[in-house]
């Protein structure tokens, strides 16, 4: 595996990258990339994205008519032309490096040139509530599996298998961990602070969820209660069901938090209950935008099943659109909070 030079890591001008949120809580900044080979159809596609907290602020796609790092949030549009030229130049260099890495890894694993493969990468830093570095991280995945990760001490690496051991030794010989540590402890933190200040109206807000419970008969003897949380930011939220005050884990379905397409998020949790016992069940919602946790019960005046099913269908379509736009660059976010 080719070792990346520090300047190919999206290092912005003389700044840094980090995450988002209010100073009342933690914030993070992460960059994701994915290089996907496509035998017989030209060079591998490369996509990269940057996030502050839950907000995407930059994006690059090598398949664009004019590939450049582009803004995805209004508060980053104020950066000058030198910023965007530097971002684009570094991202293109990163793309070329990862294309070479794909070839190298295919050789490590003795794989055919006819098959498609994916190399994913993530780097980022978290700030604590005091605005200081909480943790930094860098991770690689190959074909959806862990490959190489920078350890929490920012001085050593963990290799997932024998092939990754080769890359680990190369990184150690080139003192890559020292370069990453300097970036994560300095540049990343500095730029995260800058982004949080420039985008504070958007990034340091807390929009509470709009909540309700719907009822969906399954059979004559049971029904599904679905607890909805809509239009909230940031994305972190907790939905739980209780029966007579005791947490329920069986027969509970919980979907992943989904973007709503307007900068907010959506989520629901459902539980199957015996017909006639609906009032014994309560949904509990915790979110930083709420002054205190909410407790909800189903009311027979709640919206009927048909409109809710329309919302479900809309969420499914929305999730598919968002996933298609993000491609593989956001498929792998494992260990980011380890």
UniProtKB/Swiss-Prot annotation:
<dbReference type="InterPro" id="IPR050208">
    <property type="entry name" value="MHC_class-I_related"/>
</dbReference>
<dbReference type="GO" id="GO:0042605">
    <property type="term" value="F:peptide antigen binding"/>
</dbReference>
<dbReference type="InterPro" id="IPR013783">
    <property type="entry name" value="Ig-like_fold"/>
</dbReference>
<dbReference type="GO" id="GO:0002767">
    <property type="term" value="P:immune response-inhibiting cell surface receptor signaling pathway"/>
</dbReference>
<feature type="disulfide bond">
    <location>
        <begin position="125"/>
        <end position="188"/>
    </location>
</feature>
<feature type="binding site">
    <location>
        <position position="101"/>
    </location>
    <ligand>
        <name>a peptide antigen</name>
    </ligand>
</feature>
<dbReference type="Pfam" id="PF07654">
    <property type="entry name" value="C1-set"/>
</dbReference>
<keyword id="KW-0964">Secreted</keyword>
<keyword id="KW-0967">Endosome</keyword>
<dbReference type="Pfam" id="PF00129">
    <property type="entry name" value="MHC_I"/>
</dbReference>
<dbReference type="GO" id="GO:0002451">
    <property type="term" value="P:peripheral B cell tolerance induction"/>
</dbReference>
<dbReference type="GO" id="GO:0001915">
    <property type="term" value="P:negative regulation of T cell mediated cytotoxicity"/>
</dbReference>
<dbReference type="GO" id="GO:0002476">
    <property type="term" value="P:antigen processing and presentation of endogenous peptide antigen via MHC class Ib"/>
</dbReference>
<keyword id="KW-1003">Cell membrane</keyword>
<dbReference type="GO" id="GO:0033106">
    <property type="term" value="C:cis-Golgi network membrane"/>
</dbReference>
<comment type="subunit">
    <text>Forms a heterotrimer with B2M and a self-peptide (peptide-bound HLA-G-B2M). HLA-G-B2M complex interacts with components of the antigen processing machinery TAPBP and TAP1-TAP2 complex; this interaction is required for loading of high affinity peptides and heterotrimer translocation to the cell surface. Interacts with CALCR; this interaction is required for appropriate folding. Interacts with COPB1; this interaction mediates the endoplasmic reticulum (ER) retrieval of HLA-G-B2M complexes that bind low affinity peptides.</text>
</comment>
<dbReference type="InterPro" id="IPR037055">
    <property type="entry name" value="MHC_I-like_Ag-recog_sf"/>
</dbReference>
<dbReference type="GO" id="GO:0045591">
    <property type="term" value="P:positive regulation of regulatory T cell differentiation"/>
</dbReference>
<feature type="binding site">
    <location>
        <position position="170"/>
    </location>
    <ligand>
        <name>a peptide antigen</name>
    </ligand>
</feature>
<dbReference type="GO" id="GO:0032735">
    <property type="term" value="P:positive regulation of interleukin-12 production"/>
</dbReference>
<dbReference type="GO" id="GO:0042610">
    <property type="term" value="F:CD8 receptor binding"/>
</dbReference>
<dbReference type="GO" id="GO:0042612">
    <property type="term" value="C:MHC class I protein complex"/>
</dbReference>
<feature type="topological domain" description="Cytoplasmic">
    <location>
        <begin position="333"/>
        <end position="338"/>
    </location>
</feature>
<dbReference type="GO" id="GO:0016525">
    <property type="term" value="P:negative regulation of angiogenesis"/>
</dbReference>
<feature type="topological domain" description="Extracellular">
    <location>
        <begin position="25"/>
        <end position="308"/>
    </location>
</feature>
<dbReference type="GO" id="GO:0009897">
    <property type="term" value="C:external side of plasma membrane"/>
</dbReference>
<dbReference type="InterPro" id="IPR036179">
    <property type="entry name" value="Ig-like_dom_sf"/>
</dbReference>
<feature type="binding site">
    <location>
        <position position="31"/>
    </location>
    <ligand>
        <name>a peptide antigen</name>
    </ligand>
</feature>
<dbReference type="GO" id="GO:0002666">
    <property type="term" value="P:positive regulation of T cell tolerance induction"/>
</dbReference>
<feature type="binding site">
    <location>
        <position position="183"/>
    </location>
    <ligand>
        <name>a peptide antigen</name>
    </ligand>
</feature>
<keyword id="KW-0391">Immunity</keyword>
<feature type="binding site">
    <location>
        <position position="167"/>
    </location>
    <ligand>
        <name>a peptide antigen</name>
    </ligand>
</feature>
<comment type="similarity">
    <text>Belongs to the MHC class I family.</text>
</comment>
<dbReference type="GO" id="GO:0001916">
    <property type="term" value="P:positive regulation of T cell mediated cytotoxicity"/>
</dbReference>
<feature type="disulfide bond">
    <location>
        <begin position="227"/>
        <end position="283"/>
    </location>
</feature>
<feature type="region of interest" description="Alpha-1">
    <location>
        <begin position="25"/>
        <end position="114"/>
    </location>
</feature>
<dbReference type="InterPro" id="IPR011161">
    <property type="entry name" value="MHC_I-like_Ag-recog"/>
</dbReference>
<feature type="binding site">
    <location>
        <position position="94"/>
    </location>
    <ligand>
        <name>a peptide antigen</name>
    </ligand>
</feature>
<feature type="signal peptide">
    <location>
        <begin position="1"/>
        <end position="24"/>
    </location>
</feature>
<keyword id="KW-1015">Disulfide bond</keyword>
<dbReference type="GO" id="GO:0002486">
    <property type="term" value="P:antigen processing and presentation of endogenous peptide antigen via MHC class I via ER pathway, TAP-independent"/>
</dbReference>
<dbReference type="InterPro" id="IPR003006">
    <property type="entry name" value="Ig/MHC_CS"/>
</dbReference>
């Amino acid at each position: 595996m080719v070792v990346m030079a520090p300047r190919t890591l999206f290092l912005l001008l003389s700044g840094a990258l980090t995450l988002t949120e209010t100073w009342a809580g933690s914030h993070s900044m992460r960059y994701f990339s994915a290089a996907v080979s496509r035998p017989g159809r030209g060079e591998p596609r490369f996509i990269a994205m940057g996030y502050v907290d839950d907000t995407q602020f930059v994006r690059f796609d090598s398949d664009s008519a004019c590939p450049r790092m582009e803004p995805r949030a209004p508060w980053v549009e104020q950066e000058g032309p030198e910023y965007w030229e530097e971002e684009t130049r570094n991202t293109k260099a990163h793309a070329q490096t990862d294309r070479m890495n794909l070839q190298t890894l295919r050789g490590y694993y003795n794989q055919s040139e006819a098959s498609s493969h994916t190399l994913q990468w993530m780097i980022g830093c978290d700030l604590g509530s005091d605005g200081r570095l909480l943790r930094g991280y860098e991770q690689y995945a190959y074909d959806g599996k862990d490959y190489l990760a920078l350890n929490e001490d920012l001085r050593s690496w963990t290799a997932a298998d024998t092939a990754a051991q080769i890359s680990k030794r190369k990184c150690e010989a080139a003192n890559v961990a020292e370069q990453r540590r300097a970036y994560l402890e300095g540049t990343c933190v500095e730029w995260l602070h800058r982004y949080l200040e420039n985008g504070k109206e958007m990034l340091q807000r807390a929009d509470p969820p709009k909540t309700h419970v719907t009822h969906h008969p399954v059979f004559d003897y049971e029904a599904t209660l679905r607890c909805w949380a809509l239009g909230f930011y940031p994305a972190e939220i907790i939905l739980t069901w209780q029966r007579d005050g005791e947490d329920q884990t069986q027969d509970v379905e919980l979907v992943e938090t989904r973007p709503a397409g307007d900068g907010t998020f959506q989520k629901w949790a459902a539980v199957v209950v015996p017909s006639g016992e609906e009032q014994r069940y309560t949904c509990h919602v915790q979110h930083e935008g709420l002054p205190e946790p909410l407790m909800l019960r189903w009311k027979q005046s709640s919206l009927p099943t048909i409109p809710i099913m329309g919302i479900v269908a809309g969420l499914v379509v929305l999730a598919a659109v968002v996933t298609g736009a993000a491609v593989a660059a956001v498929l792998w976010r494992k260990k980011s909070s380890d």
